[in-house]
């Protein structure tokens, strides 16, 4: 089941995060950047339950292909011509319980400072990771980090690129990589991997030469309010001894306002029904107990960072109806949103309780 969701995630990310961004620059071929990096790091012991695994120093390699935006779409100039890229990443964890991992991710690489010879960038990406070695109750029960072979990955990185020649650049970087299946399969403490990087970039064009285009006017919807109605579904495993995957669904009503070219602010109400909580409650309650309602309702505020049809989503919510106290009183959400049309959108979101993944939400909605 996780594999099916994983390939759906890969399709959406590769189709919207890479090709969708690139499609807007199709009239003029934008220059490419090819990179090869060596990486080294350590596993962060973010909970006592994984300290026995945070003893090695993983090493890895990355190959990536980036397209330098050049002004063919209005948002290129708004973000000072970022790069969009596809990366293939390999890690050897030097620990037999963890083995190796292979990942593919799409990302945006935003420059904060750029001269003819130097760049200082922030990179943010997401994708899929594959772990041949995972938790097995009989043979690998100490691997509490990785419960499934297929996992989502999130990557954040600071990079410094300095020119060695007209086309060749030396790259130094600091990164944080996260691997998790979003509680679809337990155990799922996930891997947090701080890294240092050293590598080379081949720039097809340096320095950047944006297209000579006229300044674009403000989008017509800046300052306008909108209403979003959406529903989401997800599946999660309760624990490693219960192999059933339980349905989690939600409905959301949100209001928002586009405050500038780059940002939407949103606030909403939503209701949740997590069927794994019913099973959990029945396991712990006495037969004579009156069971509380496992449904929850919450209110949230959030931000959407806009890249054409694509947006990075972040929410912070509070439960105001929570009879069964199975988690903290607040929740967070990180995700990717894509507008298929002006009205119809889809999301892939990770809902989190206090840093621990709760569920991956697959959302479909309507903007009014």
Model feature map: region roles:
Residues 48-51, 91-94, 140-146, 182-188, ...:
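Extracellular loop and loop/strand-boundary signature of outer-membrane beta-barrel proteins
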Residues 72-75, 116-120, 162, 166-170, ...:
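Repeated loop/turn-to-beta-strand initiation elements of outer-membrane beta-barrel proteins
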Residues 55-56, 92-101, 116, 239-246, ...:
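Solvent-exposed loop/turn segments connecting transmembrane beta-strands
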Residues 1-35, 120, 168, 194, ...:
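Bacterial Sec-dependent N-terminal signal peptides
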Residues 38-44, 67-69, 88-94, 126-134, ...:
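Transmembrane beta-strands of outer-membrane beta-barrel pores
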Residues 63-65, 192-213, 357-368:
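Outer-membrane beta-barrel "beta-signal"
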Residues 62-66, 107-109, 157-159, 199-201, ...:
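Outer-membrane beta-barrel architecture
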């Amino acid at each position: 089941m996780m594999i099916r969701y994983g390939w759906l995630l890969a399709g959406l990310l590769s189709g919207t995060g890479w090709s969708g961004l690139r499609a807007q620059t199709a009239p003029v071929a934008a220059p490419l950047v090819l990179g090869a990096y060596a990486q080294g790091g350590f596993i962060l012991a973010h909970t006592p339950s994984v300290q026995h695994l945070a003893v090695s120093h993983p090493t890895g390699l990355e190959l990536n292909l980036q397209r330098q935006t050049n002004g063919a779409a209005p948002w290129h100039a708004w973000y000072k011509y970022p790069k969009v890229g596809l990366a293939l990443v390999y890690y050897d964890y030097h620990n037999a319980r963890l083995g190796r991992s292979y990942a593919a991710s799409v990302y945006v690489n935003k420059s904060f400072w750029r001269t003819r010879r130097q760049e200082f960038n922030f990179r943010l990406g997401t994708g899929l990771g594959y772990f041949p070695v995972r938790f097995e109750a009989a043979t690998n029960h100490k691997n509490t980090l990785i419960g499934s072979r297929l996992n989502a990955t999130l990557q954040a990185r600071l990079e410094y690129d300095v020119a060695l020649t007209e086309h060749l650049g030396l790259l130094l970087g600091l990164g944080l990589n996260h691997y998790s299946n979003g509680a679809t399969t337990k155990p799922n403490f996930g891997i947090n991997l701080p890294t240092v990087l050293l590598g080379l970039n081949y720039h097809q064009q340096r320095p950047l030469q944006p297209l000579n285009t006229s300044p674009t006017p403000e989008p017509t919807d800046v300052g306008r309010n909108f209403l979003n109605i959406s529903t989401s579904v997800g599946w999660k495993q309760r624990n490693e001894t219960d192999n059933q995957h339980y349905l989690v669904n939600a409905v959301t009503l949100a209001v928002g306002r586009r405050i500038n070219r780059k940002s939407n602010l949103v606030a909403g109400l939503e209701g949740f029904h997590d069927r794994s909580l019913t099973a959990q409650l029945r396991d712990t309650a006495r037969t004579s107990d009156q069971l509380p309602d496992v449904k929850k309702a919450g209110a949230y505020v959030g931000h959407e960072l806009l890249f054409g049809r694509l947006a990075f989503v972040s929410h912070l919510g509070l439960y105001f109806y929570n009879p069964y106290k199975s988690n903290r009183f607040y929740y967070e959400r990180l995700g990717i949103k894509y507008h298929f049309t002006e009205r119809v959108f889809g999301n892939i979101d990770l809902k989190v309780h206090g840093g621990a993944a709760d569920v991956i939400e697959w959302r479909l909605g309507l903007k009014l």
